[in-house]
Swiss-Prot record:
<comment type="function">
    <text>Catalyzes the dehydration of L-rhamnonate to 2-keto-3-deoxy-L-rhamnonate (KDR).</text>
</comment>
<feature type="binding site">
    <location>
        <position position="33"/>
    </location>
    <ligand>
        <name>substrate</name>
    </ligand>
</feature>
<keyword id="KW-0456">Lyase</keyword>
<dbReference type="InterPro" id="IPR018110">
    <property type="entry name" value="Mandel_Rmase/mucon_lact_enz_CS"/>
</dbReference>
<feature type="site" description="Transition state stabilizer">
    <location>
        <position position="349"/>
    </location>
</feature>
<feature type="binding site">
    <location>
        <position position="349"/>
    </location>
    <ligand>
        <name>substrate</name>
    </ligand>
</feature>
<dbReference type="GO" id="GO:0016052">
    <property type="term" value="P:carbohydrate catabolic process"/>
</dbReference>
<dbReference type="Pfam" id="PF13378">
    <property type="entry name" value="MR_MLE_C"/>
</dbReference>
<feature type="site" description="Increases basicity of active site His">
    <location>
        <position position="302"/>
    </location>
</feature>
<dbReference type="InterPro" id="IPR013342">
    <property type="entry name" value="Mandelate_racemase_C"/>
</dbReference>
<feature type="binding site">
    <location>
        <position position="226"/>
    </location>
    <ligand>
        <name>Mg(2+)</name>
    </ligand>
</feature>
<feature type="active site" description="Proton acceptor">
    <location>
        <position position="329"/>
    </location>
</feature>
<feature type="binding site">
    <location>
        <position position="59"/>
    </location>
    <ligand>
        <name>substrate</name>
    </ligand>
</feature>
<dbReference type="Pfam" id="PF02746">
    <property type="entry name" value="MR_MLE_N"/>
</dbReference>
<protein>
    <recommendedName>
        <fullName>L-rhamnonate dehydratase</fullName>
        <ecNumber>4.2.1.90</ecNumber>
    </recommendedName>
</protein>
<comment type="subunit">
    <text>Homooctamer; tetramer of dimers.</text>
</comment>
<dbReference type="GO" id="GO:0050032">
    <property type="term" value="F:L-rhamnonate dehydratase activity"/>
</dbReference>
Length: 405
């Protein structure tokens, strides 16, 4: 009888945070909105708060960066560790150290689905449809996958069944699609700057931005718009048609997550050939099933917010069953290892985190070490051939441990 590898149990889970409202500002890391001054990501970008003029100019003005980065580390009995980062900060630390720890410690490192199910069910009474709690669960889940990969000596994508393509090709999200084209990306996604409170003038301004970028980038380069939940159905339909002459590939997250009927109406009335996409701020498997039923073209879960890799795999299966694509919201290595195994993810997102989008900067810089970035818009699967997610925690960052158990 062949020997079966004996897997260790989890000895301890630990949680730290960096950045956010109670630590240093501009820390970056898992909370990529927590950037310094003069950064494109905090420019005049349309949001649900833009209708209040005092919060229109800057997303940080209404507190988009107050949470900061959550870091979860799990340690096995043999001393090996796995970790992950997400957006949950100090409050996420409390949830891990005071509640979720009981479902993690003492389990085998391979008990990922069991731990995941127990975390979900134990937090139902205060998690609602996602948000902070789901971000925290996602971070734990990713840390568990990282640990499991390191214990067995395999990259996470091989634990999921292996790659279905040799490389991942990327589009870039940022303010300068023209620069993204020069860097080898297949497309560029820009934020909208105006919303329903700006009326038709806002539509004309955003359409003019698309027209300008189309002239700079040429006919074949993809252009997309990220609307970040800032619109209503009528405005979104008008904006989509205003941008149609400039061959806009898709219009993204026009409406808040709960407005499923609105997404169905938008898809029905969008210009022929223009895709409708959403999912970044949906936080449960059930919400993605309902979103899929609206008929949108691409679902865009964030693996650090939707329940982790365990849930992302299930979301991809839902999308595949309906002939839809799943293109995760930019999550660096945490999505790279997933999407290279998905047959319905032909490309992926890279979020530009340099202030003016002119240089390639790792998305979760500086909290991750050895975080890969695309070369000529691509990452080859061989880059991912390291145990776990293939990155290390930068312990020179100011890691704050606010709680213990």
């Amino acid at each position: 009888m062949e020997n079966i590898m004996t897997l260790p149990k989890i000895k301890q889970v630990r949680a730290w945070f960096t950045g956010g409202a109670t630590a240093e500002k501009g820390a970056g890391g898992g909370d990529y909105h927590d950037q310094g001054a003069n950064h494109w990501i905090d420019d005049h970008i349309a949001t649900p708060m833009s209708k209040y003029r005092e919060y229109e100019q800057s997303r940080q003005s209404f507190g988009i960066n107050v949470l900061g980065t959550l870091i979860v580390e799990v340690e096995a009995e043999n001393g090996q560790t796995g970790f992950a980062v997400s957006t949950a900060g100090e409050m996420g630390c409390f949830i891990v150290e005071k509640h979720l720890n009981r479902f993690i410690e003492g389990k085998c490192v391979s008990d990922i689905k069991l731990i995941h199910d127990q975390m979900l069910n134990a937090t139902l009474y205060y998690s609602g449809s996602g948000g902070l709690v789901m971000n925290t669960i996602s971070c734990v889940d990713l840390a568990l996958w990282d640990l499991f990969g390191k214990v067995v000596g395999l990259p996470v994508y091989k634990l999921l069944g292996g790659a279905v393509r040799d490389e991942i090709q990327f589009y870039a999200t940022g303010a300068r699609p023209d620069l993204a084209k020069e860097m080898g990306f297949i497309g560029g996604k820009m934020p909208t700057h105006w919303g329903p409170h700006d009326g038709d003038a806002g539509i004309r301004k955003d359409a003019a931005m698309v027209a300008d970028m189309r002239e700079k980038c040429g006919e074949d380069f993809w252009l997309m718009l990220d609307c970040w939940m800032s619109q209503d159905v009528n405005y979104a339909i008008k904006l989509a048609h205003a941008c149609a002459p400039y061959n806009l590939k898709w219009i993204e997250e026009c409406l808040p997550p709960q407005q499923y009927e609105g997404y169905r109406e938008l898809k029905h009335n969008a210009p022929a050939g223009m895709m409708v996409t959403s999912g970044e701020h949906h936080g449960t498997l059930q919400s993605f099933r309902t979103l899929s039923e609206t008929g949108i073209d691409i679902m865009q879960p964030d693996v650090g917010w939707c329940g982790g890799l365990t849930t992302l795999v299930e979301i991809a299966a839902i999308a595949k069953s309906r002939g839809q694509l799943v293109v995760p919201h930019g999550s660096s290595v945490y999505s790279h290892h997933a999407v290279i195994t998905f047959t319905n993810t032909p490309f992926s997102e890279f979020l530009m985190t340099s202030p003016d989008c002119s240089t390639m900067r790792p998305q979760f810089d500086p909290i991750l070490l050895n975080e890969p970035v695309p070369v000529n818009g691509r990452i080859h699967k061989s880059v991912l051939d390291k145990p776990g997610f293939g990155v290390e925690l930068n312990r020179d960052c100011n890691l704050n441990p606010p709680y213990s158990h």
